[in-house]
């Protein structure tokens, strides 16, 4: 208890005369001091309790915000991982046979070279050779058809503008009738798988024509 409260409850006030102005003033002053002292104590208690409530709440709010940020970052990372995984799986499906297909194209080239090596007219004079050549042609077509079923497509660059992404120029052909760099001859067929070049077409391009005419590239 404060001194003011003790004074207010002191027995000396029990015998005060309320009719006496000095006693009334003394009693009033003691009561004012008592009320002020208790009001100050109550205010201090309220402030102390408020601080105890505000600090933990602010800490919880900060912790909640930090956890929410971590959760959002984790969700973004998981979404990026999901997309990357889906893309890798799609690429694996589309391009898993790329090396095998490239090797099979070399076999196809050899079959075509074997057919080209047969002298013109020899098949008409030799039934056995004709049958063999037809068998080789059928085998080569079946091989290419099988590759096409797995996404391998032949490039048809004849008459199109040279595109270094799909074509490999080996020589130039003088020709003023078509724009410069127009593909004039295909030495070796090119192929794509999906959106990737499996093998560029080896071509000869025109030289001596107009230089400012754009010819649309077609790698179908």
Curated annotation (Swiss-Prot):
InterPro entries: GrpE, GrpE_coiled_coil, GrpE_head. It is found in: Cytoplasm. One of its GO terms (molecular function) is adenyl-nucleotide exchange factor activity. Its main location: cytoplasm. Keywords: Chaperone, Cytoplasm, Stress response. Residues 1-22 are annotated as: Disordered. One of its GO terms (biological process) is protein folding. Homodimer. Belongs to the GrpE family. Participates actively in the response to hyperosmotic and heat shock by preventing the aggregation of stress-denatured proteins, in association with DnaK and GrpE. It is the nucleotide exchange factor for DnaK and may function as a thermosensor. Unfolded proteins bind initially to DnaJ; upon interaction with the DnaJ-bound protein, DnaK hydrolyzes its bound ATP, resulting in the formation of a stable complex. GrpE releases ADP from DnaK; ATP binding to DnaK triggers the release of the substrate protein, thus completing the reaction cycle. This is Protein GrpE. It comes from Bartonella henselae (strain ATCC 49882 / DSM 28221 / CCUG 30454 / Houston 1) (Rochalimaea henselae). The gene is grpE.
């Amino acid at each position: 208890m404060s001194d003011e409260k003790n004074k207010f409850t002191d027995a000396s006030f029990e015998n005060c005369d309320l009719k006496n102005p000095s006693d009334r003033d003394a009693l009033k002053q003691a009561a004012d001091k008592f009320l002020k002292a208790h009001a100050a104590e109550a205010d201090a208690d309220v402030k102390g309790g408020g601080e105890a409530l505000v600090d933990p709440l602010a800490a919880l709010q900060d912790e909640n915000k930090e956890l929410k940020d971590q959760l959002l970052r984790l969700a973004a990372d998981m979404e990026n991982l999901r997309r990357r995984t889906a893309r890798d799986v799609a690429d694996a499906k589309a391009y898993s046979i790329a090396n095998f297909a490239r090797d099979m194209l070399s076999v196809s080239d050899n079959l075509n070279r074997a057919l080209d090596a047969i002298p013109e007219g020899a098949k008409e004079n030799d039934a056995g050779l004709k049958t063999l050549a037809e068998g080789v042609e059928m085998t080569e077509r079946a091989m290419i058809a099988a590759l096409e079923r797995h996404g391998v497509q032949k490039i048809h660059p004849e008459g199109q503008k040279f595109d270094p992404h799909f074509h490999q120029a080996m020589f130039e052909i003088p020709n003023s009738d078509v724009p410069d760099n127009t593909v004039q001859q295909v030495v070796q067929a090119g192929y794509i798988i999906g959106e990737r070049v499996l093998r560029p077409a080896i071509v000869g391009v025109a030289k001596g024509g107009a230089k400012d005419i754009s010819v649309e590239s077609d790698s179908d």
